[in-house]
């Protein structure tokens, strides 16, 4: 008992060290003390891509290239560079910056995060939000990380920075949000192991002395983004409208901004302007020509110094009308027009003054709207037409229909409170014709040169989702107790672009069909919790699209309150798995993944054990990743020739401070 009291005293001291701050307990704790805090669920995910929808290809180290194995995983603009392998680590303007609406209630909010792991892996971040006046707010996010890597020549350093501010007039007629983001990733490339056999069968394998393909090869990836959004409301409407479901937030396209969607829904008629400037650069350097790895050295056989730059200007102006009574329902309509100026530049590896550049311009018009009724029925639709320098007929059309069953509101609830959703069905259709990423068309470097004129990609998608929600466990990452979600999608793509077995771009002119099905289940039985995710993917052209047939994530944990409910803790195990498939290989010189037929990977379970702890706003996790490393054959790859790390221990903390001012 004395030991327990000592542990509790230490944790309480840690969580209350700073004077002048009061801590905010989550609503579920204050309303129902015997319920666990779902904010703690998933806290042990220490890296991008290790969450419930985990399965991505990675070279194994923090800061190395990433690729999703979900077919058609990303939503892209009409013009996109294709430099996506490191975006997972970046701060992005598409994410709502700063604290959540709950956290904004206070005058100041701060958050500290720190993760420490084996091989000198350290990850530190800080977040601060300041409400200067009732009309002006500002904030700062900063993150820095370092890792030596589990294998030779894998050192990486990451730095991300985001500063933002918002302004709103007292009558709420005008508001402005702006932020500036800067990301920098320096990652050593080792080209993978020289011999997979030595890794897989050698009894006393030393990861740091194992032979790798590169000695001194690095990739430098930078991005700078300035984003601004302003909105002028023609009428002030301070009374909150009656909302019956989520469809009044217009379409997914419109609500992907940094302003709070609830604030947007209060306005009936407003004009919105979005501006974005983005500059990206990638630098690939090698100390010599690695002839055993690269087939060509077009410019210099002694070294490589390749640069690629992207500049993107984006402006959008939209007129929005919301909460209009139509057909006994509530409707929202908008008309948006945007202009994109896209520049793709490459520097000659020998003569830094020699540029190869491509500039494209695009103008798009997008009308859309949504409608919903009190019986839970709703629909969304939009159409976007592009006019560009390529003279291709680019467009995108989207339509969805959904039905939600809402639990009756309590008598004491506010009149405009929508109630609790317990069942939802959504069906959607999507059709798109767009340009392939620019990297497929133009590239000039020491090891790769190509100039292609590919056809537009013809993309179609049909999807159905069904969700069932059980009683509220707590509002967090995984929703509710006994929640169940199943979805199925059918993709059909003509003129799909990809990188072939020689790491060169190619276009497949036939139609590729893919079936994607997902199952999510969350069950809580007393103190035991089970989270299960299963994905099924099937492509009819397996020679072009390589996907694992099944991939799964399972988390089983026990949670309880200790020390008179002062400490909440979780103890559990995570398991990730996928079936055999010919996973894409990685080309460091271009930062792209390409087809390979030499090595089949998968059929291996990654097992992690963890313990999460929380006192007020102080959280701590202890985690042993890849517990089963070495128990069976060493076949743990997600990318050929790049084995995943072995057994590693990690510890992480998250500390939030809120100065609550009424």
Describe the function of each predicted region.
Residues 6-14:
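Sec-dependent N-terminal signal peptides
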Residues 21-224, 232-245, 406-421, 641-648, ...:
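Membrane-proximal, glycine/serine-rich, low-complexity loop/turn segments characteristic
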Residues 1-5:
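Positively charged n-region of N-terminal signal peptides that target proteins for export
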Residues 14-21:
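C-terminal segment of classical bacterial N-terminal signal peptides
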Residues 213, 221-290, 297-662:
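Exposed, low-structure sequence patches enriched in small/polar residues
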Residues 13, 172, 580:
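Phosphate/oxyanion-binding loops and surfaces in catalytic or ligand/nucleic-acid-binding neighborhoods
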């Amino acid at each position: 008992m004395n030991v327990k009291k000592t542990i509790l005293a230490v944790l309480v001291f840690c969580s209350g060290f700073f004077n002048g701050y009061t801590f905010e307990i989550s609503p579920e704790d204050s309303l129902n003390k015997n319920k666990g805090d779902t904010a703690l669920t998933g806290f042990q995910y220490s890296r991008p891509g290790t969450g419930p929808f985990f399965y991505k290809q990675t070279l194994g180290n923090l800061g190395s290239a990433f690729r999703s194995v979900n077919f058609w995983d990303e939503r892209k603009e009409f013009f996109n560079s294709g430099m996506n392998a490191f975006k997972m680590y970046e701060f992005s303007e598409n994410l709502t910056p700063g604290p959540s609406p709950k956290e904004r209630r206070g005058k100041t909010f701060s958050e500290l995060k720190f993760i420490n792991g084996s091989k000198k892996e350290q990850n530190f971040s800080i977040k601060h939000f300041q409400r200067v006046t009732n009309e002006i707010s500002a904030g700062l996010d900063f993150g820095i990380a370092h890792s030596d890597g589990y294998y030779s020549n894998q050192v990486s350093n990451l730095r991300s920075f985001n500063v933002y501010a918002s302004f709103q007039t007292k009558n709420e007629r005008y508001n402005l949000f702006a932020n500036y983001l800067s990301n920098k990733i320096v990652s050593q490339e080792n080209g993978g192991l020289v011999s997979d056999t030595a890794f897989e069968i050698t009894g006393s394998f030393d990861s740091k002395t194992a032979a790798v393909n590169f000695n001194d090869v690095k990739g430098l990836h930078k991005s700078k983004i300035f984003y601004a959004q302003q909105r002028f409301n023609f009428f002030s409407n301070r009374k909150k409208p009656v909302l019956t479901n989520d469809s009044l937030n217009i379409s997914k396209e419109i609500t992907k901004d940094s302003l709070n969607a609830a604030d947007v829904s209060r306005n009936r008629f407003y004009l919105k302007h979005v501006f974005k400037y983005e500059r990206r650069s990638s630098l690939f350097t090698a100390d010599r020509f690695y002839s055993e790895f690269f087939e060509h050295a077009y410019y210099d056989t002694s070294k490589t110094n390749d640069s690629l730059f992207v500049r993107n200007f984006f402006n959008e102006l939209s007129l929005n009308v919301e909460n209009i009574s139509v057909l006994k329902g509530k409707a929202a309509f908008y008309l948006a027009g945007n202009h994109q100026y896209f520049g793709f530049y490459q520097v000659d590896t020998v003569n830094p003054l020699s540029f190869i550049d491509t500039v494209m311009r695009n103008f798009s018009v997008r009308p859309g709207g949504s409608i919903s009724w009190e019986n839970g029925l709703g629909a969304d639709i939009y159409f976007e037409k592009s006019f560009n320098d390529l003279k291709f007929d680019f467009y995108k059309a989207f339509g969805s229909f959904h039905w939600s069953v809402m639990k009756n509101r309590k008598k004491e609830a506010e009149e405009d409170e929508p109630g609790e959703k317990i069942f939802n069905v959504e069906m959607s259709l999507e059709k798109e014709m767009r340009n392939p990423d620019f990297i497929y068309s133009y590239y000039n470097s020491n090891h790769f040169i190509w100039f292609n004129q590919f056809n537009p990609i013809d993309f179609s998608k049909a999807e159905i989702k069904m969700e069932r929600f059980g009683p509220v466990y707590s509002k967090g990452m995984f929703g509710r107790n006994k929640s169940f979600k199943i979805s199925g999608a059918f993709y059909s793509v003509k003129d799909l672009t990809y990188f072939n077995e020689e790491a060169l771009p190619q276009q497949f002119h036939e139609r590729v069909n893919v079936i994607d099905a997902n199952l999510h289940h969350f069950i809580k039985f007393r103190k035991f919790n089970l989270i299960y995710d299963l994905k099924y993917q099937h492509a009819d052209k397996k020679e072009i699209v390589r996907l694992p047939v099944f991939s799964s994530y399972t988390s089983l944990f026990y949670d309880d309150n200790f020390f008179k409910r002062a400490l909440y803790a979780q103890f559990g195990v995570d398991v990730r798995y996928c079936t055999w498939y010919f996973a894409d290989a990685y080309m460091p010189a271009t930062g792209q993944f390409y087809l390979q037929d030499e090595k089949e990977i998968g059929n291996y379970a990654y097992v992690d054990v963890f313990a999460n702890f929380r006192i007020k706003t102080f959280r701590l996790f202890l985690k042993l990743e890849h517990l089963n490393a070495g128990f069976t054959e060493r076949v743990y790859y997600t990318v050929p020739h790049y084995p995943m790390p072995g057994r590693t221990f990690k510890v992480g903390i998250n500390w939030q401070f809120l100065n609550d001012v009424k």
